[in-house]
Amino acid sequence: RDPKIAKIYPDGIHGAIAKYLRSRPGFEVRTAALEEPENGLSDKILNATDVLVWWGHMAHDKVSDAVVERVYHRITGEGMGLIVLHSGHYSKIFRRLTGTSCSLRWREAGEKERLWVVAPGHPIAEGIGDYFEIEHTEMYGEYFDIPSPDELVFISWFPGGEVFRSGCCFYRGIGKIFYFRPGHETFPIFHDPNVLKVIENAARWAAPVDRPRPATILGAINVKPLEKLS
């Protein structure tokens, strides 16, 4: 709706990300939008989804609670991956998964961001140098009210002096979640090769593992001993 944003992303942010991923081997991509029935995330669609990429801004409260619960159980109980981008930190699903407010400092001044790789052996950092820079972006700063990440891949620095945990991995149930900070809508960040490469890497990392689901994922079970008890 904003002409400035439409000029940067004529097919929407979701369209820009989808276009890139469709160009990469091994990806079959579809998009979902808030205004679609069930926010575009019906049981049928989610059951056919290995990894869900989530970007949202200003309309988090308009996402159906039923859809959020559906996504939550698909992640924790069935292993679907989730990638949360930028202002998606305030999405219902990310806060449901973290159990925290996910609040932070912010400033919109078009300043530079330098993202340092702090886990160089992590698959999400594959193909990325020691750091990369985004010339103009919105600042996010600590304290970021999230649980301590299970793995931290990137830390951002901003000229105003702030730092931010900008690439955070979490495990919930049998699902994998990656939060990635870059992505303010008024800048062409989702055309940046490094940003797109990280999203691609994260999607491959977050994809479900092909193995039987643990019996205890859906609830506690009473079991017989594997060995003879004396």
Q: Model-flagged regions — what are they?
A:
Residues 1-2, 37, 59, 89-91, ...:
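Short, solvent-exposed loop/turn segments at secondary-structure junctions
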Residues 13, 66-69, 193-195:
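Charged helix-capping and loop-helix junction motifs
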Residues 29-34, 57-62, 156-157:
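Short, flexible loop segments at the rims of nucleotide/cofactor-binding pockets, characterized by
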Residues 97-102, 132-149, 194-211:
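Oxidoreductase and adenylate-handling cofactor-binding alpha/beta cores
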